[in-house]
Amino acid sequence: MSHLALQPGFDFQQAGKEVLEIEREGLAELDQYINQHFTLACEKMFNCTGKVVVMGMGKSGHIGRKMAATFASTGTSSFFVHPGEAAHGDLGMVTPQDVVIAISNSGESSEIAALIPVLKRLHVPLICITGRPESSMARAADVHLCVKVPKEACPLGLAPTSSTTATLVMGDALAVALLKARGFTAEDFALSHPGGALGRKLLLRVSDIMHTGDEIPHVNKHATLRDALLEITRKNLGMTVICDESMKIDGIFTDGDLRRMFDMGGDMRQLGIAEVMTPGGIRVRPGILAVDALNLMQSRHITSVLVADGDQLLGVLHMHDLLRAGVV
């Protein structure tokens, strides 16, 4: 490859905008291919009792991997198989209960062509995504999805650009259509993304991260203010609950309450905690989502809440617990 000096006045931005315009035109063409064949493909995938197995070589393989990942995270169980590996044993992962999606812009991938007779023998439904309706793969498919584009964004017409974008969008169209048909919810999505921010927000409950047992700072209503301050210091949550031996809640006292008392002045040494506590306290139930507890704390401008069943104290949740859990 020759390495020439940059042409004077070459406009990178204009070159980039030309790519966007060409690919936009390609996607506009895609609308006509969301037709009865698309419906048939969706029906086969929806009724599939096994997996949706995606195959593709080269750039089509990269798109296929993304497609399979999108299916899997949106309610359509799916995985990718490399056609070359499939020809050397990995085809054993495919069963008659599965549906195969084979991707090739030309529709003439020799690696996929070698697999089609075996898939037919196994009676595996075959959906082919190509840019050529007259190709051998399109003719062999049970359902053909066309992703033909006017031209590639590559000025040489060689590097897959517009065609791979169209294929990716067709995959997204399949995934989202199936998602809607299944009634797939944000909670369902979170179940397959437990390590992500969305998963934490939609799955993590107060009971998963609250302080319980000896971790709960608490004193009885006959304690002095000094006793309460020692308990706050020991448990390091910036507050203490005032409750009886059965953990029935009387109130709460926080370090914010203490600061406000200093602002008021006066002798605090002989005060009982019952004189200065906030009766009741703001409470949540253990089964609510941690993100809902966060929203409550932010709306009330507080850093901790009591976790309770009625007046019965079950735990304490602090803003720092939400930070550590990645909810904030």
Swiss-Prot record:
Ion transport keyword on record: no
What reactions does this protein catalyze?
A: D-arabinose 5-phosphate = D-ribulose 5-phosphate
Q: One Pfam family this chain carries? A: SIS
- The annotated site for Catalytically relevant falls at 59, 111, 152, 193
Q: In which pathway does it act?
A: Carbohydrate biosynthesis; 3-deoxy-D-manno-octulosonate biosynthesis; 3-deoxy-D-manno-octulosonate from D-ribulose 5-phosphate: step 1/3; Bacterial outer membrane biogenesis; lipopolysaccharide biosynthesis
Top-level taxon of the source organism: Bacteria
Q: Which UniProt keywords apply?
A: Carbohydrate metabolism, CBS domain, Isomerase, Lipopolysaccharide biosynthesis, Metal-binding, Repeat, Zinc
- Does the keyword section mention Metal-binding? yes
Any GO MF annotation of the entry: metal ion binding
UniProt-listed Gene3D superfamilies:
CBS-domain, Glucose-6-phosphate isomerase like protein, domain 1
Which residues does the annotation say bind Zn(2+)? 82
Q: Name one GO biological process term.
A: lipopolysaccharide biosynthetic process
Residues noted as binding substrate in the record, renumbered to the chain: 75-76, 82, 88, 114-123, 148-150, 275
In this protein, which residues make up the domain named SIS?
A: 41-184
- Renumbered to this chain, the signal peptide range is none
User: What does the protein in this record do?
Assistant: Involved in the biosynthesis of 3-deoxy-D-manno-octulosonate (KDO), a unique 8-carbon sugar component of lipopolysaccharides (LPSs). Catalyzes the reversible aldol-ketol isomerization between D-ribulose 5-phosphate (Ru5P) and D-arabinose 5-phosphate (A5P).
Share what the entry says about its subunit structure, partners included.
Homotetramer.
Give the family this protein belongs to, as stated in its UniProt record.
Belongs to the SIS family. GutQ/KpsF subfamily.
Protein name, entry field: Arabinose 5-phosphate isomerase KdsD
Its organism's taxonomic lineage begins at:
Bacteria, Pseudomonadati, Pseudomonadota, Gammaproteobacteria, Enterobacterales
